[in-house]
């Protein structure tokens, strides 16, 4: 209960301090109110001139920041695309290793054809008969 009383006392002190500060500001503003009447409360000519000078550099900075963010976005999306492709390949590899292999239907292999002997000629002379050697496969 004592903690609640301390909190309430601190809030009351804070409220009184704020009220005192605001009261002093209102007293100071009442003496300056005569000079404020002469100047309009809308944005004057000088303010618009200052804003127009600051508008071009501000737009340039905003454009540069936008361009850099766009480039960063493109590079990030490119990296994301490569990562997704690698992820799909890895998942496919894991699935191919995890799933059982279904054997294809067994077909009888065709017999290997017997090849004719290959002539090998050791001489450049056309008068001699070629020597026939059989190659064993």
Swiss-Prot record:
Gene Ontology cellular component terms for the protein in this record: apical plasma membrane
Membrane-crossing residue ranges in chain numbering: 7-27, 55-75, 76-96
Keywords: Cell membrane, Membrane, Transmembrane, Transmembrane helix
Predominant location: membrane
Superkingdom of the organism of origin: Eukaryota
Subunit structure, as described in the record: Interacts with crb.
Extra facts: Apnoia means lack of air in Greek.
Name assigned to this protein: Protein apnoia
Lineage, broadest ranks: Eukaryota, Metazoa, Ecdysozoa, Arthropoda, Hexapoda
């Amino acid at each position: 209960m004592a903690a609640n009383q301390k909190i309430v006392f601190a809030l009351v002190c804070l409220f009184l301090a704020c009220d005192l500060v605001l009261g002093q500001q209102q007293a100071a503003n009442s003496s300056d109110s005569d000079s404020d009447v002469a100047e309009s409360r809308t944005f004057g000519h000088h303010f618009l001139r200052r804003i127009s000078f600051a508008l071009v550099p501000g737009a340039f900075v905003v454009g540069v920041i936008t361009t850099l963010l766009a480039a960063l976005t493109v590079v990030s999306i490119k990296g994301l695309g490569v990562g997704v492709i690698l992820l799909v390949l890895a998942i496919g590899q894991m699935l191919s290793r995890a799933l059982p292999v279904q054997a294809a239907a067994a077909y009888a292999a065709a017999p290997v054809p017997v090849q004719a002997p290959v002539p090998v000629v050791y001489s450049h002379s056309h008068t001699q008969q070629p020597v026939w050697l059989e190659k064993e496969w």
